């Protein structure tokens, strides 16, 4: 059938359409039936399309002989009036189905239908049939208007062509863009699959505070708020890490949390000020076991949700089936920068010269560890297309990770990169309270030196470590970026229902 969705209109015409619809609503109010709320839905379009998909089996005669009747509701997405009979399409959360409407059956309801608009929400009851073109249809015996739509939907051919408008008016985007709906359905399935995977392995899901007295758990600038009753400044959490590790101290040996973090930083195709993370901790695991876990949960989630481990993301074909590469950070830097020697990697003066040569801007306070990271981010990160664990980060940029037993100045840490984007971060946790206190103190000095992303000193966390924390491995996976990977989305805003936007003027 040909859908009759209004074409794009200039503002004046749109206003006239809205006025026309408001007049129709006024007439409904006069009849006392503006927004009825007594209809109970029993069937969904997608379920019917799946059950009766075989047109050879479910012929019009077979459908009529089945005696099957349905009771459903949805948004009117198309209508074609042809005198005594009409066709329409309604859309619910599961899909669309066609309606076949007859004036001699519906009576006054058919007359009313002629005045309804695309976008209205309607209820229908009736049997099933199939048109000459083979399309499954509901042969309506009853029809009602449930909600009057006052604003016209975008043109079906162009949809919401303005990307910013899609983000601002996600409610419209979800109505008219099936691909957008599918992304968010997959997002829900991804999170559900990860929860099931962890629950099956004796991990306990927990909830930790969203407002912190002391911001910690990541090097990031926090959002600040104020508790009026206590006259106390609080911080939206940048990470749940320190609270989750307190739970490990308390004997909850496998814990995880899937929740929001907040970082007062820039907005880009990869970053949103609030974002979702999976963070977990497992006692008696090293960063090697946590890398194994990371690889397996991502691979199994892809297989569960997509039915495959092969995905396309931002122009790259990614295969999650083979073992993920594991590559030391200093080795990766030297591979991509032959001018940098092994000795240079821990030599601040040498790295400063390399940064100058590479035109990498750095701060005077950076030691060799931070300089090495800057060179990695500028010259290596974007080249990591297939899944790659970058391991053994410098202590300077890993304030919560355990120091390496064999490599002074390095830690037992990893980050997972896919197509040049960081998806996960993990390490063997630092459980030496004296070492942790010294690291916190170094962070405080960095903050005093102007680094507004450096951590605060958390005395209570040090006290918790003094009770003793078992050797522990930890992991954080960016859920938003994982959803980007598994849905092929190129912007984080495409996988957030309501991404951060500047307020409209």
From Swiss-Prot:
One of its GO terms (cellular component) is cytosol. Its cofactor is Mg(2+). Pfam families: tRNA-synt_2, tRNA_anti-codon. GO terms for molecular function: ATP binding; lysine-tRNA ligase activity; magnesium ion binding; tRNA binding. Its EC number is 6.1.1.6. One of its GO terms (biological process) is lysyl-tRNA aminoacylation. InterPro entries: Aa-tRNA-synt_II, aa-tRNA-synth_II, aa-tRNA-synth_II/BPL/LPL, Lys-tRNA-ligase_II, Lys-tRNA-ligase_II_N, Lys-tRNA-synth_II_C, NA-bd_OB-fold, NA-bd_OB_tRNA. It is an enzyme of class 6 (ligase). It catalyses: tRNA(Lys) + L-lysine + ATP = L-lysyl-tRNA(Lys) + AMP + diphosphate. Its main location: cytoplasm. CDD domains: LysRS_core, LysRS_N. It is found in: Cytoplasm. Binds 3 Mg(2+) ions per subunit. Keywords: Aminoacyl-tRNA synthetase, ATP-binding, Cytoplasm, Ligase, Magnesium, Metal-binding, Nucleotide-binding, Protein biosynthesis. Mg(2+) 1 binds at residues 415, 422. It comes from the Bacteria. Mg(2+) 2 binds at residue 422. Belongs to the class-II aminoacyl-tRNA synthetase family. Homodimer. HAMAP family: Lys_tRNA_synth_class2. This is Lysine--tRNA ligase. It comes from Xanthomonas oryzae pv. oryzae (strain PXO99A).
């Amino acid at each position: 059938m040909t859908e009759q969705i209004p074409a794009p209109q200039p503002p004046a015409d749109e206003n006239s359409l809205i006025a026309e619809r408001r007049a129709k609503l006024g007439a409904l109010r006069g009849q006392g039936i503006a927004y009825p709320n007594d209809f109970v839905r029993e069937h969904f379009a997608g379920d019917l399309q799946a059950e009766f998909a075989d047109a050879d089996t479910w012929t019009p005669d077979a459908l009529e002989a089945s005696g099957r009747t349905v009771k459903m509701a949805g948004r009117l997405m198309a209508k074609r009036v042809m005198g005594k009979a009409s066709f329409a399409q309604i859309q619910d959360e599961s899909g669309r189905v066609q309606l076949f409407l007859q004036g001699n059956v519906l009576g006054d309801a058919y007359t009313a239908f002629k005045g309804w608009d695309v976008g209205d929400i309607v209820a229908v009851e009736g049997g099933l049939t199939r048109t000459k073109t083979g399309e499954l249809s509901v042969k309506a015996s009853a029809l009602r208007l449930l909600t009057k739509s006052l604003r016209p939907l975008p043109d079906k051919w162009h949809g919401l062509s303005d990307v910013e408008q899609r983000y601002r008016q996600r409610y419209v985007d979800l109505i008219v863009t099936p691909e957008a709906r599918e992304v968010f359905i997959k997002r829900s399935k991804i999170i559900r699959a990860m929860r099931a995977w962890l629950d099956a392995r004796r991990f306990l899901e927990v909830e930790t505070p969203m407002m912190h007295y002391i911001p910690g758990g990541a090097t990031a600038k926090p959002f600040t708020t104020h508790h009026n009753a206590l006259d106390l400044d609080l911080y939206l959490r940048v990470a749940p890490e320190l609270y989750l590790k307190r739970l490990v101290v308390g004997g909850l040996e496998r814990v995880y949390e899937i929740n929001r973090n907040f970082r007062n930083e820039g907005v880009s195709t990869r970053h949103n000020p609030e974002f979702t993370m999976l963070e977990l901790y497992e006692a008696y695991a090293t960063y090697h076991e946590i890398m194994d876990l990371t690889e397996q949960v991502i691979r199994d989630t892809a297989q569960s949700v997509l039915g495959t481990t092969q995905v396309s993301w931002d122009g790259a074909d990614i295969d999650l089936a083979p073992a993920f590469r594991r590559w030391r950070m200093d080795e990766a830097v030297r591979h991509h920068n032959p001018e940098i020697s092994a000795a240079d990697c821990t030599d601040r003066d040498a790295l400063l010269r390399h940064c100058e040569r590479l035109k990498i801007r750095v701060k005077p306070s950076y030691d060799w560890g931070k300089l090495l990271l800057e060179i990695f981010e500028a010259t290596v990160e974007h080249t990591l297309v297939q899944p790659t664990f970058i391991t053994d980060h410098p202590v300077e940029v890993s304030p919560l990770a355990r120091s390496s037993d064999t490599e002074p100045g390095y830690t037992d840490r990893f980050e997972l990169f896919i197509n040049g984007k960081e998806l996960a971060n993990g390490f063997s946790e630092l459980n030496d309270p004296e070492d942790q206190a010294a690291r916190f103190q170094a962070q405080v000095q960095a903050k005093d030196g102007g680094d507004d992303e450096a951590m605060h000193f958390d005395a209570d966390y040090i006290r918790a470590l003094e009770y003793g924390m078992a050797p522990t491995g930890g992991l954080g996976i960016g859920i938003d970026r994982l959803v980007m990977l598994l849905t092929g989305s190129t912007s984080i805003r495409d996988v957030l229902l309501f991404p951060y936007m500047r307020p409209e003027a």
